[in-house]
């Protein structure tokens, strides 16, 4: 009797592989529009806008009804549960609108971080209970990929072995459950930029974390060709006094991936991690221009770095919708170019060089 069991049928593997590859098609990346109700409330507070369901719906409509040209640069959108079931003011479901434009709808399925006992202020992520049923429902409702975020912190004692092991296994369990239900899992082990650590420390920790993740994915029989990785770019801590160039960041990031990420993985979609819009775009561009071996597509899955200027231009006012859409489209184009190593010049956006860092950031 063979000890190897086919955990997914050939048809399901083909669908997962094709959708994962479509997400990282050349010149395209993801819009992360999966902020929780609480998190988007903080963004709205900055423009003195009340955090109501209608305002959240109107803002997401602004993004999704931008000139269809945005679909040349955005392959998919990560949605929050509420958004999956919202509609345009004309009554068209957002999921249907996105699919008509050739944009894959995705869904955030984790339920947030919780303290991890036996550690020094570390955490794990909850949401595995009834995940299979939720994934099946989201697939039926039109979603084709999912995202799950785990968080690790750098300090004199962290990340601990326990935190790396626990979060890697949580990500792997999530990934397998997603694949069983037809969703491409985006695996997000975020090493937070909080702290004063240097670039070398950030690289070493990122390599450790990714090593744990890919060991766990193998242990859980996850089909790598039907997954994507969403890691942090390797940068020094926010409070580090030493300055590094985008080329330094690119080298550290690519080396970390080379040492840990199997070539079977079709793509890496970086989170922006509180960088300014300009810094995130420049770093992505430098990563793609770096001359080392890069067997994966290297693209973006940005939230704040694709939206900050759009919100600032919109201000919650209907007459500013076109201005907000213009900002979003400009950022989508810039990052599409950066994912090919072809971004040049500056970003002339409302929040271009403004840091978007939030300490101990939670979605």
Curated annotation (Swiss-Prot):
Site (Necessary for preference for fructose 1,6-bisphosphate over fructose 1-phosphate): 363
Signal peptide as annotated in the record: none
Claim: Lyase is one of the keywords in the record: yes
The entry's keywords: Glycolysis, Lyase, Schiff base
Protein name: Fructose-bisphosphate aldolase
GO terms (BP aspect): glycolytic process
Reactions listed under catalytic activity: beta-D-fructose 1,6-bisphosphate = D-glyceraldehyde 3-phosphate + dihydroxyacetone phosphate
Example GO molecular function: fructose-bisphosphate aldolase activity
Membrane-spanning ranges: none
Family: Belongs to the class I fructose-bisphosphate aldolase family.
Pathway: Carbohydrate degradation; glycolysis; D-glyceraldehyde 3-phosphate and glycerone phosphate from D-glucose: step 4/4
Enzyme Commission numbers on file: 4.1.2.13
Binding site for substrate: 56, 147
Keyword RNA-binding: no
Any Pfam family: Glycolytic
Active site per database record: 188, 230
């Amino acid at each position: 009797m063979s000890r190897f069991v086919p955990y997914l049928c050939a048809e399901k593997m083909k669908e997962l592989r094709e959708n994962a590859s479509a997400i990282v098609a050349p010149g395209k990346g993801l819009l992360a529009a999966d902020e929780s109700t609480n998190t988007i409330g903080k963004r709205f507070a900055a423009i003195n806008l009340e955090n109501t369901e209608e305002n959240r719906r109107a803002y997401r409509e602004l993004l999704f009804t931008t000139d269809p040209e945005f679909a040349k640069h955005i392959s998919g959108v990560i949605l929050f549960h509420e958004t999956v079931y919202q509609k345009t003011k004309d009554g068209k479901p957002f999921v249907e609108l996105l699919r008509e434009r050739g944009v894959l709808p995705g869904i955030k399925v984790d339920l947030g971080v919780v303290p991890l006992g036996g550690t020094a202020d570390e955490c794990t992520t909850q949401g595995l209970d009834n995940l299979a049923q939720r994934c099946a429902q989201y697939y039926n409702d039109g979603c084709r990929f999912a995202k799950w975020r785990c968080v690790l912190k750098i300090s004199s004692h962290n990340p601990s072995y326990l935190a790396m092991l626990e979060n890697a296994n949580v990500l792997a369990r999530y990934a397998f459950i997603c694949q069983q239900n037809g969703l491409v899992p985006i695996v997000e082990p975020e090493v937070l930029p909080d702290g004063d650590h240097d670039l070398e420390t950030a690289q070493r920790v990122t390599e450790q974390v990714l090593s744990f993740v890919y060991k766990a994915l193998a242990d859980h029989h996850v089909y790598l060709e039907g997954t994507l990785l969403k890691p942090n770019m390797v940068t020094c801590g926010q409070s580090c006094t030493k300055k590094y160039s985008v080329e330094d960041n690119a080298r550290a990031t690519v080396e970390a991936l080379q040492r840990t990420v199997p070539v079977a993985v079709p793509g890496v979609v970086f989170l922006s991690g509180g960088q300014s819009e300009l810094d995130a775009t420049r770093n992505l561009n430098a990563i793609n221009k770096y001359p080392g071996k890069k067997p994966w597509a290297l693209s973006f899955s940005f939230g704040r770095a694709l939206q900050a200027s759009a919100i600032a231009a919109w201000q919650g006012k209907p007459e500013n919708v076109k201005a907000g859409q213009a900002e979003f489209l400009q950022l989508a184009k810039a990052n599409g170019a950066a994912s090919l190593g072809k971004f040049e010049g500056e970003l002339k956006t409302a929040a271009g060089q403004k840091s978007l860092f939030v300490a101990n950031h939670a979605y």
